[in-house]
Swiss-Prot record:
Binding of Mg(2+) 4, residues: 857, 859
UniProt similarity note: Belongs to the CarB family.
Protein EC: 6.3.4.16, 6.3.5.5
Region annotation Allosteric domain: where it falls in the sequence: 968-1113
Sequence ranges assigned to domain ATP-grasp in this UniProt record: 138-333, 695-886
Protein name, per record: Carbamoyl phosphate synthase large chain
Cofactor entry: Mg(2+); Mn(2+)
Gene designation: carB
Record text on cofactor binding: Binds 4 Mg(2+) or Mn(2+) ions per subunit.
Length: 1113
C-alpha cells in the first residue's frame, strides 16, 4: 500500500544523552528516519536534548528542538507548531530507544496526544505495552504456544519474597520499561534480593519487576524482525551471544549469524519470533526478540522483546547492510516491504531477507578503570560503554580483529605477557578455571590462557558455560600458536595461515622475537606479497552487484584472491579516520566531526573514505562517506586501506584530527610511512603534547601557566611538588578524558598515586602541575588556517577548576567573564594556534585566577565540545576544519558564509541564546563488590558518558533545562537538605536564603544548621548516619532520603574521614532513589537561578532554525 496521505507532519522523538544501554545507535537510527521522512515530502520536527548528535543539526529537520524529552516540553512543542500553522499529525517514537518509548507512553497517559489529535506511528501504545509490560508479554508468549521462564510480576517487596519462596534462589530480577538491563540483576541470597529488587522497583517507571527462575548457563540468541501493514514479516538477522545467559547481551561478545544452532532450532525460533511480532501487533516497524536455549535438551524459552529499533538493530543493520531504521521509518508512514527497494543492490525489494557470507563479531568496550572500587562482574545490568564490530571470513579471524579494534592495553592475544592480565594466576590452571566462573571483561583472554595451561574444552565449558563450539575454535587458535612458536623460521605458508586466522603483525611479532616488533613482520609480509583483499557487504552473498561500496578486509590462503575495491570516480580521495569504540572521554562528539567532514568534503568534490569500527555510529552508515571500510584503527589496518585506495586513484591525504586521540596517535607513524597527513602536522601535534616544547612556546609568547615539572620516580615527583607547593595535579602524559589524573594534597597521597598509576604512563613521565584552587575554568574552541585564527566558542565552566571539563557543566556565552577577560582569551588563543602551527581545530583550557589567565593545556584537534559550540553559535566547526585541512582559508569560508565576519565566539550578538551543557553520569550502573553504590564526587578523572544542552534567553532557564535533560530535574517546591564543608559555608548563605524565601523547607546537619540560623534562615536539624551508628535514637537523613522525604540535596564534600563517610552515605542514597544532588558551590548558585526561572514560568521552547544566527542548510 502506498504512503499514507493523512500524515503531513511528524514529530520524531530522539533518545537524549548517551547513557550506558542507550548510545549513539539511536542517533544513527534517528538520522536515517529524519532523512527518509524529508525525502518523502513530510514536514519533520525533532526533539532531542543531545547536542552531540547529527540528528539535531538544523538541516536534518524542519524544526529542531534541543529540549528535555519530557511531556511538558513536548506539549509546548505541539502548541507552538499549531501556533505557527504547522500542526503535528503523528509521533514516531520507535527510533529513540527506551527514552522515546517511555515519553510516548506518558504523552498518552496524560492525554496530551488526544488533546492535540496526534497519533503514534511505528508502534501504537497497545503494541508498546504488550511488548514492554512483563506480564502482558508473558501471556502473549503462552498464547502463541511458546514458553517463558517461570516467573511472576511483583509490585512490592512482599510480593517479591512470596515469589522467591515459590521459585527458590537464585532468581533473575527484571524491571519493566527500562533499558540496558538497568535495575536488573541476579539474586543468589536474601541480601542480594533486597538490594536488587528494591533498586529494580525504583528504576522501573511502572514500579514493577519480573522475578524469574534462574536459567543461567543457557545459550542466548536474538532475532531482528520487521513487519508491515500487509503482514509481510522478514527476519533480518540472527545474533548469538558467546557468553551464556546471565551476562547482559550488551556486555557479551556476540556473533552474527548465529553459529551453533541446529537448523531445527533456528526454524522453531524463527516461527516463534514471527508469531510474537504478529501477536504483539508491531505492524509498521522493527523489533528485537531474545531467546534462550537449554544446551542439554534444546528447550527454547522467550526472554523478552523490544517493540522498537534497539542497540541490536544497529548491529544487525551494519552486519547485513540492511538499513533497519530507514525501513522502519518508511513502514511507519504506510509503505509495505515489497514497495521499498534495497539501497545496496538497487534492485531487490526490502522483503528479501539478507544473506551474509561472512562472520560478524561484536565486542564490548568497558571503562572499569574510571570507577575505582566498582564490581567488575558482568551481570544482567549492562556496564559496557561502547562496542566494536568486525567482519571476517571465519569466526576466529573476525574475533581477532574485534579484540584489536577495542583499543585496550591488550591489543589481542599474546600482545602483553600473561602476567599483565593474569597476575599471579598466569601459571595456575586451577586458579584461572575458578576465576572463569565469574564473568569479567577479560574472560576470553582467561579462556585462551587456561587452554595453554592444559585445560580441556570440557573443563572450560564447565567453568564458563561458553558453548563448546566457540571453545573448540579458540583451541584451534592455541594449537596454531604453538605451531607458530615452534617453526624454525616463518615461511610464506605459515605467515599466510597466521593472517588467515586474523592475527595482526603485532601478535605474530610477540611470538617471534627475531623480528624485533611488528615492523619486522610487516617488512617480511610485504616482501612476500601477502596483503588482504577487500570484500564487499552486499546483503545478498554476491548474488546481485552492490551499488554501495562498504568493505572489510580478509586474508585468503589463495595468493590469487582479488580485491573488490574498484575506483568510484576520478576525484581525489580523502581518508577520514574515525574514533573507534565509544569510551569515556572519546564518544559520539568525535564521530559528529568525522561525519561532517565526510559530507562537506564530498560536497566540494572529493571522494571521501571513512575508516571506523564502531557499529553504533552515523559515520559507519553506508551512505555517509563515498566509501566505508569497517576496520580496526591500528597502524597496520589503516595502512592496508590506504594502500588499497592508492592502488585505485589519487589520495589527497588522511585526516587524523577529528576522531579524538585514537587517530591522532597514528599520525606520526603514518607520516613516516609516506602517508600524507593533512590538516595539523604530526610535528605540531607532538609539540603541543611535549611539555618541554610547549613550555618553551608559552615562555616565548609570555603566556602564564601553572608551575609544573616532570618526574619518572616518586623521589623526582616529591621534589617537584615541594618546589611548586601542594595541592598538585598529577597525571601521565598523552591522555584523553583525564585518565589517571588526580589532585594530590600531600606527600603520602603523592606516593600512593605514583605506586598505583605509573603503569599508565607508557614510557612517558608523570606530569606534576601546581593546582589552581578556586579558579574559573574556561574552555575554548578555535579554528586556524596557519595565518588567521577564528575564536569559535568561549565556555565558562560552572564547576570550579579541578573537575574534568567533560564532567563540568558550562555556559556559552560565558556568564561572569568581562570584555577584558575575553580579549585576553582571544589574544592567548591566537598566539597558541599560530605558535603550534594548527591547521584546523584547536581546543584550549584556561584557568582565570586573580585576574591572571593561565594556560592549562592546548589540544590541536577536534574536542568533545565541537558539536555543542556548533549548535550554540550556528557555525559548523567540523565542516570548516575539514575544508581548512584541504587548503581553504578562514577568509574563503567567510566569503562562502560558513563563518561569520561580523562577530566570533567571543563576541556573540546580544540576542544570541544562552546555552548550558551538562554532563550525564553513569553512577546508577556501578556498585562495589559489597553491593554499595560508588561515590558520586567529581574529580579530574572524567566519568560522564554523555551530555545534554539547555537553550534559553536567560541563564536560569537554560540551566534548568540542562538539568532536566540530564535526569536531574530541579524541584520547584519541597524539601532541601543542606550539608556543606566549612570552607563553603559563607558562600552558600545567600543561595540558601533565596530557597528559604521561595518556601522550601530546609533540613541541615548540626554544624550547617548553626550557621544558617545565625543568618536568619529557619531550618530543621537532622541526624547523620554516623549519629545513628554511635547510638543516637531517631531517623537519619539517609533514611529520610531513601523514604522520599527530600527533593534536592546540596552536599559539598568535607575533609575529615568521618564527614567524608557521612557524605558518601548521603550521595549513595541520592543515587539510589534518584534525588537531584549538587556537590559544588557554583552548582548550588546555578541551581537556585534555575529554580527561580522555573517558578517564574519563563521556560519556553524555541527551534534551532528560529535562532537568528543559525546557519541554514
Amino acid at each position: 500500500m502506498p504512503k499514507r496521505s493523512d500524515i503531513n507532519h511528524v514529530l520524531v522523538i530522539g533518545s537524549g544523552p548517551i547513557v550506558i544501554g542507550q548510545a549513539c545507535e539511536f542517533d544513527y537510527s534517528g538520522t536515517q528516519a529524519c532523512r527518509v521522512l524529508k525525502e518523502e515530502g513530510l514536514r519533520v520536527t525533532l526533539i532531542n536534548s543531545n547536542p552531540a548528535t547529527i540528528m539535531t543539526d538544523p538541516e536534518m529537520a524542519d524544526h529542531t528542538y534541543v529540549e528535555p524529552i519530557e511531556p511538558e516540553y513536548i506539549d509546548k512543542i505541539f502548541a507552538k507548531e499549531i501556533e505557527q500553522g504547522h500542526p503535528i499529525d503523528a509521533v514516531l517514537a520507535t527510533l529513540g530507544g527506551q527514552t522515546a518509548l517511555n515519553a510516548a507512553i506518558q504523552l498518552d497517559r496524560l492525554g496530551i496526544l488526544e488533546k492535540y489529535g496526534v497519533e503514534l506511528i511505528g508502534a501504537d501504545i497497545d503494541a508498546i505495552e504488550r511488548g514492554e509490560d512483563r506480564q502482558k508479554f508473558k501471556d502473549i508468549v503462552t498464547t502463541i504456544g511458546g514458553e517463558s521462564a517461570r516467573s511472576r510480576v511483583c509490585h512490592n517487596m512482599e510480593e517479591v519474597h512470596e515469589t522467591v519462596a515459590e521459585l527458590g534462589l537464585p532468581v533473575v530480577v527484571r524491571p519493566s520499561f527500562t533499558m540496558g538491563g538497568l535495575g536488573s540483576g541476579l539474586a543468589y541470597n536474601t541480601e542480594d534480593l533486597e538490594r536488587i529488587a528494591g533498586g529494580g522497583l525504583a528504576a522501573s517507571p511502572e514500579a514493577n519487576v519480573l522475578i524469574e527462575e534462574s536459567i543461567l548457563g543457557w545459550k542466548e540468541f536474538e532475532l531482528e524482525l520487521m513487519r508491515d501493514t500487509a503482514d509481510n514479516v522478514v527476519v533480518i538477522c540472527s545474533i548469538e551471544n558467546v557468553d551464556a545467559l546471565g551476562v547482559h547481551t550488551g556486555d557479551s561478545v556476540t556473533v552474527a549469524p548465529a553459529l551453533t544452532l541446529t537448523d531445527r532450532e533456528f526454524q522453531k525460533m524463527r516461527d516463534q519470533g514471527i508469531a510474537i511480532i504478529r501477536e504483539v501487533g508491531v505492524d509498521t516497524g522493527g523489533c528485537n526478540i531474545q531467546f534462550a536455549i537449554n544446551p542439554v535438551d534444546g528447550r527454547i524459552i522467550t526472554i523478552e522483546m523490544n517493540p522498537r529499533v534497539s542497540r541490536s538493530s544497529a548491529l544487525a543493520s551494519k552486519a547485513t547492510g540492511f538499513p533497519i531504521a530507514k525501513m522502519a521509518a518508511k513502514l511507519a508512514i504506510g509503505y509495505t516491504l515489497d514497495e521499498i527497494t534495497n539501497d545496496i543492490t538497487g534492485e531487490t525489494p526490502a522483503a528479501f531477507e539478507p544473506t551474509i557470507d561472512y562472520v560478524v563479531v561484536k565486542a564490548p568496550r568497558f571503562a572499569f578503570e574510571k570507577f575505582v572500587g566498582a564490581d567488575d562482574t558482568l551481570t544482567t545490568t549492562m556496564k559496557s560503554v561502547g562496542e566494536v564490530m568486525s567482519l571476517g571470513r571465519n569466526y576466529i579471524a573476525a574475533l581477532n580483529k574485534a579484540l584489536r579494534s577495542l583499543e585496550t592495553k591488550q591489543q589481542g592475544f599474546w600482545t602483553k605477557p600473561d602476567e599483565f592480565f593474569a597476575g599471579e594466576r598466569a601459571t595456575d590452571k586451577a586458579a584461572v578455571l575458578e576465576d572463569l566462573k565469574r564473568p569479567t571483561e577479560g574472560r576470553l583472554y582467561d579462556v585462551e590462557l587456561a587452554m595453554r595451561l592444559g585445560a580441556s574444552v570440557e573443563e572450560l565449558y564447565e567453568a564458563s558455560s561458553i558453548d563448546p563450539w566457540f571453545l573448540a575454535e579458540l583451541e584451534a587458535l592455541v594449537q596454531f600458536r604453538q605451531k607458530l612458536v615452534d617453526a624454525p623460521f616463518l615461511n610464506e605458508d605459515l605467515l599466510r595461515e597466521a593472517k588467515f586466522m586474523g592475527l595482526s603483525d603485532l601478535q605474530i611479532a610477540a611470538l617471534r622475537p627475531e623480528f624485533a616488533g611488528e615492523d619486522g613482520v610487516r617488512t617480511l609480509r610485504l616482501s612476500l606479497g601477502i596483503r588482504p583483499v577487500f570484500k564487499t557487504v552486499d546483503t545478498c552473498a554476491a548474488e546481485f552487484e552492490a551499488k554501495t561500496p562498504y568493505h572489510y578486509s580478509a586474508y585468503e590462503l589463495d595468493p590469487a584472491a582479488e580485491s573488490e575495491v574498484a575506483p568510484q570516480t576520478e576525484r581525489e580521495k580523502v581518508l577520514i579516520l574515525g574514533s573507534g569504540p565509544n569510551r569515556i572521554g572519546q564518544g559520539i562528539e568525535f564521530d559528529y566531526s568525522c561525519v561532517h567532514a565526510a559530507l562537506e568534503l564530498s560536497r566540494v568534490g572529493y571522494e571521501t573514505v571513512m575508516v571506523n569500527c564502531n557499529p553504533e555510529t552515523v559515520s559507519t552508515d553506508y551512505d555517509t562517506a563515498d566509501r566505508l571500510y569497517f576496520e580496526p584503527l591500528t597502524f597496520e589496518d589503516v595502512m592496508e586501506v590506504y594502500h588499497a585506495e592508492a592502488q585505485s586513484g589519487t589520495v589527497a591525504g588522511v585526516i587524523v584530527q577529528l576522531g579524538g586521540q585514537t587517530p591522532l596517535g597514528l599520525a606520526d607513524r603514518l607520516k613516516k610511512a609516506g602517508v600524507p597527513v593533512i590538516g595539523t602536522s604530526p610535528e605540531a601535534i607532538d609539540m603541543a603534547e611535549d611539555r618541554g616544547e610547549f613550555g618553551a612556546l608559552l615562555n616565548r609568547e609570555q603566556l602564564p601557566a601553572p608551575a609544573f615539572g616532570t618526574a619518572t620516580s616518586f623521589e623526582e615527583a616529591r621534589t617537584v611538588a615541594d618546589e611548586i607547593s601542594y595541592p598538585v595535579l598529577v597525571r601521565p602524559s598523552y591522555v584523553l578524558g583525564g585518565r589517571g589524573m588526580e589532585i594530590v594534597y600531600d606527600e603520602a597521597s603523592l606516593e600512593d598515586y605514583i605506586n598505583r598509576a605509573t603503569e599508565l604512563s607508557s614510557d612517558h613521565p608523570v606530569l606534576v602541575d601546581r593546582f589552581l584552587d578556586n579558579a574559573i575554568e574556561i574552555d575554548v574552541d578555535a579554528l586556524c588556517d596557519g595565518d588567521e585564527v577564528y575564536l569559535a566558542g568561549v565556555m565558562e565552566h560552572i564547576e570550579e577548576a579541578g573537575i574534568h571539563s567533560g564532567d563540568s557543566a558550562c555556559a556559552l556565552p560565558p556568564m561572569t567573564l568581562g570584555a577584558q577577560d575575553i580579549e585576553k582569551v582571544r589574544e592567548a588563543t591566537k598566539k597558541l594556534a599560530l605558535g603550534i602551527g594548527v591547521q584546523g581545530l584547536m581546543n584550549v583550557q584556561y584557568a582565570l585566577k586573580d585576574d591572571i589567565l593561565y594556560v592549562i593545556e592546548a589540544n590541536p584537534r577536534a574536542s568533545r565540545t565541537v558539536p555543542f559550540v556548533s549548535k550554540a553559535t550556528g557555525v559548523n566547526l567540523a565542516k570548516a576544519a575539514s575544508r581548512i585541512a584541504v587548503g581553504a582559508t578562514i577568509k574563503d569560508l567567510q566569503d562562502e558564509g560558513m563563518i561569520p565576519t561580523e562577530y566570533d565566539g567571543g563576541s556573540l550578538p546580544l540576542d544570541a541564546p544562552i546555552a548550558v551543557k551538562e554532563a550525564v553520569l553513569p553512577f546508577n550502573r556501578f556498585r562495589r563488590p559489597d553491593g554499595k553504590t560508588l561515590d558520586t564526587l567529581l574529580s579530574p578523572e572524567m566519568k560522564s558518558t554523555g551530555e545534554v544542552m539547555g537553550l534559553a534567553n536567560n541563564f536560569g532557564a537554560a540551566y534548568a533545562k540542562a538539568e532536566a535533560g540530564a535526569f536531574g530535574a530541579l524541584p520547584t517546591e519541597g524539601t532541601v537538605f543542606v550539608t556543606v564543608a566549612n570552607r563553603d559555608k559563607r558562600t552558600l548563605i545567600l543561595p540558601i536564603q533565596r530557597l528559604a524565601l521561595m518556601g522550601y523547607k530546609i533540613l541541615a546537619t548540626e554544624g550547617t544548621a548553626g550557621m544558617l540560623r545565625r543568618n536568619g534562615i529557619e531550618c530543621e536539624v537532622v541526624l547523620k548516619a554516623s549519629d545513628i551508628r554511635e547510638g543516637v535514637e531517631g531517623k537519619s537523613i539517609v533514611d529520610r532520603i531513601r523514604e522520599g522525604e527530600v527533593d534536592l540535596i546540596l552536599n559539598t564534600p568535607a575533609g575529615s574521614a568521618g564527614a567524608r563517610h557521612d557524605g558518601y552515605d548521603i550521595r549513595a542514597a541520592a543515587v539510589t532513589v534518584g534525588v537531584p544532588l549538587i556537590t559544588t558551590v557554583q552548582g548550588v548558585t546555578a541551581a537556585v537561578q534555575g529554580i527561580e526561572a522555573l517558578r517564574e514560568g519563563v521556560v519556553s521552547v524555541r527551534a534551532l532554525q528560529e535562532l537568528d544566527h543559525a546557519v541554514k542548510a
